[in-house]
Design a protein with these regions (language model features):
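C-terminal motif of bacterial Sec signal peptides marking the signal peptidase cleavage site
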Residues: 3-5
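Surface-exposed binding patches on compact interaction domains or structured appendages
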Residues: 7-28, 48-96, 101
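Terminal connector regions
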Residues: 9-10, 101-133
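Buried hydrophobic-core signal for structured, non-transmembrane domains
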Residues: 40-47, 95, 110-118, 239, ...
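Right-handed parallel beta-helix/beta-spiral solenoid domain characteristic of secreted/periplasmic
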Residues: 136-140, 208-244, 337
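Feature marks extracellular polysaccharide-active and adherence modules
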Residues: 165, 173, 179, 187, ...
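Predominantly extracellular beta-rich ligand-binding scaffolds that present long acidic/polar faces
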Residues: 294, 299-430
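C-terminal accessory segments
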Residues: 412-474
Length: 474
């Protein structure tokens, strides 16, 4: 179907400076289908100029495979040629999408573009629909943080507690924002799929609680379901936590966070002494940037794996950190770039916008941990004298040519001994050989503090280093 208003026809003007205008730059079909169905939206195309314009082609970029169709002059099409819009006139196009939410191969976010070529100019309109029966969190506002624009939708407003359950998956388009003094609690078994460029954002004084279990972890990953994307990093942005508040620690328990850019990004600007994050029984893997990125936070992590990141697995400037029974392993093997950073990079100073250092006290304790990877040195500390820097390693395996067990801060540590991970590229950081030097070499005091490994296997008495106990035949 198409409609024109009645204007006097003019000569077609081929001037490349003349372009079309549209009623929208994105057409959103916001219906969430529970069964096979279709929806229709309207797009208005304007010629605001005093001469006629010829549109050389209008086409769906996705072609025959696109679930979208558009309708002009009563004809449903994927491509139309040589359509004229008279001067100061408009054209109506009707767009339709057909969705089968029961098709497990259907993506959560269905996208295409409607392309217009006029006088050599290519203009596109984004088409967007929801492909499965899920809870969709769609950005409707934008906030500027340090010069970066973050599109967001508030999921937990001030003084509000919002609970996400496992009944249906959550798909985040943009950022799901926790407002100041709001709380988002994510229950066991919840599946969260983040679209490109999106994630979860806890605003200053907000609180995020991820409350999974060993049997039903919370999973946060990208929204592409094709097999090719199972291990593709950088599909979504991050879990970002701004300044926290006293008595409202962020907590992440029994979670799997994979295939993003920064798995967990916690940054304090104003209230470093009140910003706390507690992590347990959690895996952060396959991030194109950092696994855990922290500025002036207090982080305690137990029974955790941070594996295979494009930059450092753990990057921390200032703050207070304690890690118990963690495996930090970087065997990055993706195609974007070669990773030349250390698995753990920590500092008590950073450079400001004028390239001048500013300092903040740093303290870190690592107990019964493994730090290993492909680099010669997988731990690097960058410290200046203007602020305190204290770090201790107790019963840890570390890959390093710079540090050794005779140096201050290292107690009962092993260096440069192959840990024998099952498949570090995959990554699978279980220990699969009785020859591994980490077996039985943990401090029992720390083992008693975390009596079961990431798989629920007891480590009481003779704990291994790292997140997993060795089990013969596993």
């Amino acid at each position: 179907m198409a409609g024109y208003s009645c204007k006097k026809s003019n000569q077609i003007n081929p001037d490349s400076n003349l372009k079309l205008s549209f009623s929208a730059d994105t057409v959103l079909f916001d219906t969430v289908f529970t069964s096979l169905g279709s929806a229709t939206q309207e797009l208005k195309i304007y010629n605001t100029h005093s001469d006629d314009l010829k549109i050389s082609s209008i086409r769906l970029v996705g072609g025959e495979d696109s679930p979208f169709r558009f309708n002009l002059d009563g004809e449903s099409a994927i491509e139309i040629y040589d359509k004229v819009i008279p001067a100061e006139d408009s054209l109506f196009s009707f767009l339709r999408v057909t969705i089968n939410p029961n098709d497990l191969n259907s993506p959560f976010v269905v996208e295409d573009e409607l392309e217009f070529i006029t006088n050599g100019n290519t203009q596109t309109i984004k088409l967007l629909a929801w492909g499965q029966n899920a809870n969709y969190i769609v950005a409707d506002k934008v906030v500027n943080i340090g010069g970066t624009l973050y599109p967001y939708h508030i999921v937990a407003d001030s003084l509000q507690t919002t609970v996400w359950t496992s009944e249906r998956p959550y798909v985040i388009y943009g950022y799901a924002l926790i407002n100041s003094y709001g709380t988002l609690r994510i229950e066991k078994g919840t599946q969260i799929y983040c679209h490109q460029g999106g994630g979860i954002l806890s605003w200053s004084d907000g609180q995020l609680i991820i409350d999974g279990t060993a049997e039903e972890p919370v999973i946060v990953q990208g929204d592409r379901l094709e097999a090719y994307y199972n291990d593709t990093p950088g599909q979504w942005e991050q879990i970002l936590m701004m300044d926290g508040r006293a008595g409202a620690d962020h907590r992440i328990s029994h979670a799997i966070i994979r295939n993003g850019t920064i798995g967990i990004n916690c940054q304090s600007v104003l209230k470093a002494t009140e910003c706390a994050l507690r992590i347990d029984n959690t895996v952060v893997e396959n991030q194109s940037g950092y696994g855990l990125f922290s500025i002036l936070y207090a982080v305690e992590a137990k029974n955790f794996v941070i594996a295979n990141c494009g930059f450092a697995n753990l990057w921390a400037f200032g703050g207070d950190y304690r890690f118990v029974h963690g495996t930090i392993a970087n065997y990055w093997n993706a195609n974007e770039h070669n990773n030349n950073e250390n698995a753990v990079l920590v500092a008590n100073y950073a450079l400001d916008g004028n390239n001048q250092p500013f300092y903040y006290p740093f303290r870190m304790e690592m107990d019964n941990c493994i730090i290993y990877g492909k680099q010669k040195d997988e731990f690097k500390g960058v410290f200046g004298p203007e602020a305190d820097s204290i770090y201790t390693f107790d019963h840890c395996l570390i890959k390093s040519e710079k540090y050794n067990g005779t140096m201050p801060g290292f107690s009962h540590c092993l260096f440069n001994l192959e840990p024998f991970f099952s498949d570090p590229i995959k990554p699978d950081c279980h220990i699969d050989s009785i020859a591994s030097p980490v077996i039985g070499m943990g401090n029992p005091l720390f083992g008693n503090e975390v009596p079961y490994d990431l798989d629920g296997v007891s480590r009481i008495g003779t704990p291994d280093m790292g997140a997993y106990q060795y089990m013969y035949g596993r």
